[in-house]
């Protein structure tokens, strides 16, 4: 008996889709959505953003599903004070869909959107032309989005940064927050260029060679690709961008990897932003290749009768959540320092971050 910001957001646009498909009537859809939005107005929020988990029996913030309601009053690095970037991206996407589909509810929707500022998730500290800024403790990849923030515990104070991480992979589900943040002019275009399509080699400047991280541990290395320079259409600032790709072993199928091999990571934003038609040579193409990789690996390597792996609820009804994905664990992996004679040939950026033993229907449906 729990829910999350992502669940609420996806439910909102699922009801709109059900109305459009004739599965529920207009009055039924409106009543469901209005009831949900009204309930959300009573939930504890921060800057309009929802917390990680909520108890559906009383609306209280949960520590974790099955672990009871939060009782802490002093900020701590746990879910009682965590505001998730990606989950609130999905929540906001649901609000935006409802506002467009049901203008009669726009006043209620606007009251929920108004306090939200996605700039809070953006790391606006000084950038360099390298992949990271070595002048900031922890060699931080500034210009990217944080995975979230802890209420009352900002990342730039003391050693708080050790509890933070960046959503550095652009080809993952947090890019919904980048779309919304840029669309609302709450994030600069920097986030688009500074986020990584793949984990890059050191930037092509002499001063970056010793400070940029060594990503040779990633799933596939060495990686084909090249550095390109892009000019942001609004700021006119230029950015070096690594454009690489992975290749499915033994084939000419090239693709952009997700971080942990999940279908959801790559394809979910296409449900809201029509990448298939707007980005036929970029993320629309990447989405199609992701589905091809999932199908090829599941049927040929795992010999599964079904395909579609992604993080999801565990199949044991305990309320748990597990990381599942196509990581290419059946292919060679040598770890850090892999080279042309001993290449890593995995299918996801993070080797071992997920297991390949669960197929989830929502991932198959996305394709």
Predicted regions and their residues:
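Ser/Thr/Asn(+Pro)-rich, low-complexity disordered segments
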Residues: 1-367
């Amino acid at each position: 008996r729990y829910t999350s910001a992502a669940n609420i957001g996806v439910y909102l646009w699922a009801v709109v889709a059900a109305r459009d498909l004739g599965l529920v009537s207009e009055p039924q859809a409106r009543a469901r959505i209005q009831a949900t939005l009204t309930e959300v107005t009573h939930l504890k929020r921060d800057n309009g953003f929802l917390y990680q988990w909520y108890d559906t029996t009383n609306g209280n913030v949960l520590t974790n599903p099955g672990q009871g309601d939060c009782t802490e009053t002093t900020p701590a690095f746990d879910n009682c004070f965590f505001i998730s970037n990606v989950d609130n991206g999905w929540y906001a996407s649901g609000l935006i869909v409802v506002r467009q589909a049901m203008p009669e509810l726009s006043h209620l929707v606007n009251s929920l959107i108004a306090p939200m500022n996605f700039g809070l998730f953006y790391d606006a500290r000084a950038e360099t032309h390298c992949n990271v800024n070595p002048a900031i403790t922890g060699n931080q990849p500034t210009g990217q989005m944080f995975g979230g923030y802890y209420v009352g515990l900002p990342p730039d104070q003391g050693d708080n940064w050790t509890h933070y991480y960046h959503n550095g992979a652009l080809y993952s589900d947090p890019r919904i927050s980048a779309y919304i943040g840029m669309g609302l002019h709450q994030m600069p275009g920097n986030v688009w260029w500074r986020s990584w399509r793949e984990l890059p080699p050191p930037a092509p400047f002499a001063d970056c060679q010793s400070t940029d991280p060594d990503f040779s541990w990633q799933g596939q290395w060495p990686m084909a690709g090249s550095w390109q320079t892009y000019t942001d259409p609004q700021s006119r600032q230029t950015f070096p961008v690594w454009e690489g790709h992975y290749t499915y072993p033994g084939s000419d199928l090239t693709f952009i990897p997700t971080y942990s091999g999940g279908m959801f990571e790559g394809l979910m934003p296409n449900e809201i932003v029509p990448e298939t038609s707007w980005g036929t040579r970029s993320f629309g193409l990447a989405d199609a290749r992701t589905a091809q990789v999932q199908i090829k690996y599941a049927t040929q390597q795992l010999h599964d009768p079904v395909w579609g792996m992604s993080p999801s609820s565990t199949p044991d009804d305990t309320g748990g959540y597990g990381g599942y994905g196509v990581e290419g664990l059946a292919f060679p992996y040598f770890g850090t320092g892999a080279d042309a004679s001993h290449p890593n040939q995995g299918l996801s950026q993070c080797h071992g971050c997920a297991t390949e033993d669960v197929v989830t229907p929502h991932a198959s449906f996305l394709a």
